[in-house]
Amino acid sequence: TNYGIGTHLADTVGDPAECQRIIRERAEKWAKEFDANSLYILYRAGIGSDMTPLAGDIKAPLLNVLADTDSVVDVALSQPTVDLLKSKGVDAEFHEIKTRYGHAGPMIDAGLWADRLRTFLDRTP
């Protein structure tokens, strides 16, 4: 899958039928709790929107962590984005992790960047 959950379940659960059951259970729970209008708004905001003029308005420090296998967010755009934010005075940094788990990799393999997060939080006011 694009998000890496199927790969993670295959690695940890093994049984394909059980993996499918878990995915369906999670999807049904998500669908009951999540407002689909939020996806529409996020989609509209991301299509044809140039936020560059507002980049300097960001006040919170940013640690952007992406997986090298992410097929949802293009990891190649991350460093240029962080460089742009820095040029606007934003405290931003990028960290790429190597994981099999795609878009969900930074959550599933959080241990791969835990030290980086700890350092980031320790220096963040």
Per-region residue spans from a language model:
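Alpha/beta-hydrolase
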Residues: 1-63
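Conserved active-site and cofactor/substrate-binding residues in soluble primary-metabolism enzymes
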Residues: 34-37, 76, 112
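Predominant activation on well-ordered alpha-helical scaffold segments within soluble catalytic domains
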Residues: 37-43, 79-82, 118
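Structural recognition of the beta-strand scaffold that forms the well-ordered cores
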Residues: 63-64, 96
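Conserved strand-to-loop "acid loop" that flanks and positions the catalytic carboxylate
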Residues: 64-70
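Conserved alpha/beta-hydrolase "acid-adjacent" motif
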Residues: 71-80
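Catalytic active-site module of serine/aspartate enzymes centered on a nucleophile-bearing elbow/loop
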Residues: 82, 86-125
